[in-house]
Amino acid sequence: MQLNGSQIFVEVLCEQGVDTLFGYPGGAVLNLYDELYKNADRITHVLTAHEQGASHAADGYARATGRTGVVLATSGPGATNLVTGIATAYMDSVPMVAFTGNVATEGLGKDGFQEAYIEGITMPITKHNFTVRRVEDLADTMRAAFRIAQSGRKGPVLVDIPKDVTAAVCEFTPKKPEPIRTVTTFNEEQVKWAAEIINGAQRPLVYFGGGVRSAASCQPLRDLLKKAEIPAAYTLMAAGVVPYGDPMNIGMVGMHGCYTSNRAVADCDVLIAVGARFSDRVALNPKTFAKNATIIQIDIDASELGKNVDVDLAIVGDAAYVLNAMLPMIEDKKHPDWIKMIHEWQAQDYHPVSDASRLMPHQVIGEVCNQCGPEAVYVTDVGQHQMWAAQYIRHTKSRGFITSGGLGTMGFGYGAAIGAQMALGRDQRVVMFTGDGSFHMNLNEACTAVSYELPIITVIFNNQVLGMVRQWQTAFYGKRFSQTDPHRKTNFVKLAEGFGLKGYHCENLAQFQEAFADALKRKGPTWIECMIDKDEKVLPMIPGGGDINDIIMK
């Protein structure tokens, strides 16, 4: 059948199972938006306040579901406003397809109104990108974009569509989506060798990251820990993969991880890294990281093997397939002395002391968990509040904690929470933690939450400073607080009212308990401002370049 480019655009989106699209209209994409208007019963379009918010929403949608997030923006500034969101998804291996409009093909490279070479700009931060110069290529290019985003190590793909392509006509043939290409092969001899090393270990430790978030990978990982009684430490991106309360879960590892997990890394004799890339927030000193251990690394991306830390055995493959193949070779073995040592270290873990005279982050987060129960989805911005949330939330779901890890994007949270809420439905409880610094970055997305009546509860830790940077200035810069005391006078309650949502101001735990209970009853979005001390710190902390011997506990 004969269709124009805009009709093909919608048909392929539906063909790929897209039910929700985040975006912002403009001149170069008017034809696409006209077709979306005609197909509003097939695809829900979410209009955000800013294209960056749309990109974070597509990201949050993908993280919450595992499906591909989709974002659409116009040419020029619309396209460049997506860059931070695309880079955020790229660093955390999130499947996303970003569609951008552009000037007509004959005008490409001539510096026309709102032209930007978005293909070149995004080349380092996408798995692949395309510029579609003929309408005949549009359908298959879109299909390729979705396939690439989900294949192997997941990530964002960009498709740039000149305006004339959206109006041109060609023959269109519908196709069924191709199966996602999964890496099912691996070196069986290496897996046997890995099993032998693990079976011979006296102090084994699993260190796992965001690469095991998929349901297929989570279960074999849990089975391995249980069968061989192996303690496990996780990265920020893997919170919830092994539930809170599992006896083998010894906590988050890295710069703001717990003492036990960091001590275990230093003292283990075999380290099994699964879906983790040894980032500089975990392997702060690559030369001393797990220096006493034989290191086995399992990763779907061959380029990550041995990239940051030298490893003894590198296995390329999908964690689910590798672990399932390894499990029958693993002996049912106990490590009583090692587990006893772990328990002794756990007695030394940092636990903040509550102070009834002021509101403290761990109390707030604990109360949120108490009132929400285990099924809530938690989203964060970036800063001290992000680390507090990672430390104190009782994580139980593999996709229940959504945060920007690799890029560390302040302003990520509200858009991501909107995406998660749209993906999971209004009956799913979504709570977003932010700080006054991060929240100022993209709080304009409040109008989106209000417009779509999304019951997102936003908890704002307001210490009236840029807390994480200030903490570093306290520790390493002689308390020279350069530009981290902004002296802002934002009244978040009045600002909330201006957006059309309910705001609360809390200075003690009783006020917060009452405010959060009330927010849970409301159908729309709410903000709860929590006043905390500007000198509140994220602890423990290992300075950059340090190791367990440099850990700061007070």
Which residue ranges define each predicted feature?
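Well-ordered beta-strand positions enriched in small/hydrophobic/aromatic, beta-favoring residues
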Residues: 69-71, 159, 378, 401, ...
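Thiamine diphosphate
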Residues: 99, 108-114, 306-308, 314-316, ...
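Active-site diphosphate/adenylate-binding microenvironment
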Residues: 6-10, 14-19, 27, 32-37, ...
